[in-house]
From Swiss-Prot:
GO terms for biological process: protein deubiquitination; proteolysis. It catalyses: Thiol-dependent hydrolysis of ester, thioester, amide, peptide and isopeptide bonds formed by the C-terminal Gly of ubiquitin (a 76-residue protein attached to proteins as an intracellular targeting signal). This is Putative ubiquitin carboxyl-terminal hydrolase 11. Residues 643-657 have a biased composition (Basic and acidic residues). CDD domains: Peptidase_C19R. The active site is at 310 (nucleophile), 838 (proton acceptor).
Amino acid sequence: MTLITDSESIGVCESSYTPEEERRIVTELNNEAEADLKEGNLYFVISNRWYTRWQRFVGLLTEEFRSGEPSEVTRPGPIDNHDIIDSESDASDPQLRMMLEEGVDYTLVQQEVWRKLVKWYKGGPPVPRKLISQGFYTKSFSVEVYLLCLTLTDSRDESTTIIRLSKQASIGQLYEMVCAGKGVAKEKARIWDYFEKKKSVLLDPSSEQSVEEAGLQFNQDILLEVDGSASSQFVMSLAENELAMVPLEPMRSDAMDIVRGGGTLSNGHSNGFKFSFFGRNTFKDDVSSRTFGKGEKRGLGGLQNLGNTCFMNSTLQCLAHTPPIVEYFLQDYRSDINAKNPLGMRGELAIAFGELLRKLWSSGQNTVAPRAFKTKLARFAPQFSGYNQHDSQEMLAFLLDGLHEDLNKVKRKPYIEAKDSDGRPDDEVAEEKWKYHKARNDSVIVDVFQGQYKSTLVCPDCGKISITFDPFMYLSLPLPSSRTRSMTVTVFYGDGSHLPMPYTVTVPKDGSCRDLSNALGTACCLDNDESLLLAEVYDHKVFKYYENPRELLNGIKDNEHIVAYRFKQMHKGPGKVKLEILHGEQEKSSDRGPKCFGTPLVTYINKEPLSGTDIATSISGLLSPLRRVHMSCVVNSGNENGHVPDESSRSILSRDTETEDNDRELSLSLLRDYYSFNLQPLESDSVVNPGSVTKVLVKWNEKEHEKYDSSYLNDLPKVHKNVLAKKTMQEGISLFSCLEAFLAEEPLGPDDMWYCPGCKEHRQANKKLDLWKLPDILVFHLKRFTYSRYFKNKIDTLVNFHIHDLDLSKYVKNEDGQSYLYELYAISNHYGGLGGGHYTAYAKLMDETKWYNFDDSRVSAVNESEIKTSAAYVLFYQRVKSDSETSDMKMD
């Protein structure tokens, strides 16, 4: 029996087009699609790993080695989307893994481009998504990558069904989908919003409202009831069914009592409060329990994660523990709402935020589901809609801007012509600019968060100096980035002589695969007649071989798994091809084929017809270090002192304890390709014509696990693991050094040149920033994420920041006599890498010194000594007023 080669079995359609022709065709198709954007256009989600390889192949991405030489590229294999597909999803209906990021994990290509790529390269699986229109004031197009996922409970038999639909689908369309799937007449069906297994709102079958506007959240429950069927266990209590009487504005005298623990807020009548009737779909957020004990602390409520909303929850908790903001929103702020501001959200965002803040401060230590706020956020900021992970600082920037516009007391903004400083004193110009700014922008956000900095531009040619004073809401501070990176790579022996061993090496951040190979060679004592083959392992398969020494390392992410296969030079060379050995085992609860596990092994074989016995012998040699040692062998091989041999000696010893007959008992199958995972049994008399890479699957059963220790194949370490261990102050950098880097003089970039009024030309001027006026609430954004054309990176450097007595006086150029001493009260943290990770918040209650960790719905106390970590991303400080300022306030 003759088996075809792997390159034939994959069925790759070798394109007759050159790379240049492929690039031209795709570029033309993209231009045509851009000119014809409309709702409903179809796009396909494609693995960014594969697409980046294709871009390099056709010249859409070009990389250079540090010497300036271009990096060589090879033609990519079949399209492989398995790295972005949830491994637990059905093969007939593949679902994307959660928390994927566009440009990092996946790329979107329009339908005609997808068709061409599939024609040229085959592969898949296809993941189609539609273009939708979003936005309230201005419409924008976006591809709905993640559909809304709902769990439908049928009250008749309590069965559950997963439903996926567009967030823009109407409630009426939801009824049609459910009724069609359940075979129920629409007029007999009732669908309830069943959030947290509670019947809260009966959805209207005739409603054109979208499921997103109705407040339905990712992975939440909905309940189907059918007329004439019993469903008593789903009866809703009267309290759940009535319209909420949401307290809008407490009287000023009681507001801070709530914050400090006095007084109560309820969901019913209470003296001293004004009420407004709202339906569930506007401002009635769900609180898991509306009662709390007497004297229970307020402000310790958690926020439920509604589907990758930890970024939002982190920001909200920091703002919900900002004293002047809490005080303002717990008092009567309605008179400040500017519903007619064309730059605002008609006051809806401010009211949604105010009601959410009120829930947090009235819920004791219970959890609040911010559904109404998220619905408003998605309406006015479609970039935060859907279920992708986002940036907490970007969320903060939008929210502060949005709240300002909703609460801007200026109804008509006067036109004010900008004036140059013309040599006038700085304090005069700064005061004038601030006055003009306040004439157009007057809100609590400006009063609390906004400061002013001085910007000085100097023309390098004529010496013209231009000084301006501009407002700021927060300070984005640069972090110094290391020029090197550490990488952990596991080395496997291609001849099966030793056990695999992980090595951690330091390489240049902009280095190449040659740098990594050289560093690994030194670490593992590579002989002169040996070489290393680098590869990326994903989902227990070899995703890519790094055979070009010039290929840059910046394409390797920290969360990836890289291995190196060690070979004698004699094992490689002309006439040799790769034999790739994968490991699989049958899942007991599944009737599908074997599931891969562990790390593939790689060796080289002759490029000539081979028998199944030849293949089995090669595989047995690679597995030999993993053979378990029988106790009798260990005892007999010990030295006279009874010492047990080391692992390498034991593996060699055990190899001699097995017979060649046992070597051939392995269950082997030829793997045609990763995409279809089509297996063909490999018998001893089979004849294999090797291709460039021949893939063979070893099926492990109890016998194999008894004979071999597969633990050495598992637990492959990541390239770099983010460790948030406690570090000393000397290991990090100070917040002051970051601030000084922000304020340092530097030339403008070539793409950001300044028009010099003296030269009448654009010049690459020198720019210097100085702090002039600092706000009561000062926010520092630590710029941990860096972006370049080919690479995105997170800087995990520990920033040593002050918790108490942050004195910024020497950085403020305005001598106004104010105190610029600050106390830290909240931190937005980011854990993990790019395109995902997790956000939390540290915050302390007003009038308390105790800190708390807000991790979505989980709230716990934390020691002050533990809040300084390399996860700190956004720092919130409150200014400590001087004695004279405090006295002036008392007199007022």
